[in-house]
Amino acid sequence: MKLGDLEFWLLTDGTFRLDGGAMFGVVPRSLWERVSPPDGRNRILMAMNSLLIRAAGKWILIETGAGDKWDAKSKDIYSFEGSPRLPEKLVARGIPPEMINIVINTHLHFDHCGWNTRLVNGEAVPVFPNARYFVQQGELDHAKAPTERDRASYFPQNFLPMEKSGQWSLLDGDAEVVPGVELIRTPGHNRDMMCVRMSGGGKTVFFFADLIPTAAHLPYPWIMAYDLYPLTTLENKKKWIQQAAREGYLVIFGHEAENPAGYLREKNNKYALEPVELDS
C-alpha cells in the first residue's frame, strides 16, 4: 500500500496461541469466546504481524516475530505455526536481511523481537547486520531487569546481542525515525511500549502493537491481564480509537490473525472494524 512516497507491506511470522483468560483479563470467557474461540487448552489463535516499509530510501521492519530459538516444551506451550517464517518472506520479496536499514521493536516481549537474532554455533547474533534497532531506553532497561510478573516475556538472547554489536538506537519518548514514520510511546501494556504512525499522501496508518492486540480487544474494558498498567491502557485505548475513527486512520493490529487491518466505525459510542485487504 502506498502513502505518498512511502510504501508498506503486511507480513507475518506465523501464528501462536496464548491463554484466552490471560488475553482478555476480567472479561468472562462466556463473552470473549464468542469472538475468539479457544482450543481445548483454553488458548486463542493469534498472528505475529510485522510491517515492511520503504521510506526515505530505507528499508524498515516493524516487529520481528517470535524467532526460532525455542525448545520443544515452549513450542508445545505456544503452538507456533506457519511457514515460511519472517526472514524467508523477506528474502522471497528480494529483501535479504542485509538490506534492512532500520528495525523497530515496539517493545521487547519475545513475540515482537524474536528474529532480532538467530543462533550461529550456539551464539545469538543479529539477523539484520546493517540495521539500527530502535526501542525505548526505558524498555531495554526494564527488559534487562524485569519483575517477577513479566520476566517470562523477556529473552535476553533477543536484545543483548545488539549491545555487543553496537546496533541499538535508544529513544526517550516519541520520535520520527524517517519522514512519515513516527514512533509514539504508548504506556499501558508496559511502561515504554510504542505504537507506530505512518503518514503520506493525505493518508495515515496506525499500528496498535499490544495496545489493542486484536480486533476483539476494541471494547474499552477488554484489556489483557498481561498489561502492567491497565488503567493507562484504558486511557490510551480511548484516545487512539477515537482519534483513528475521527480522522480515518487505517489501523493494523499486532496479533489479529483473521482481519489484521481496517477502518474503525463508531455507532452509539461503540467501535467496530471494517476490514480491508492489504498487500503482503
Where are these regions (language model features)?
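Active-site metal-binding loops of divalent metal-dependent hydrolases
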Residues: 13-15, 64-67, 108, 138-139, ...
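Hydrophobic/aromatic beta-strand patches that form the interior of the parallel beta-sheet core
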Residues: 9-11, 104, 134, 169-171, ...
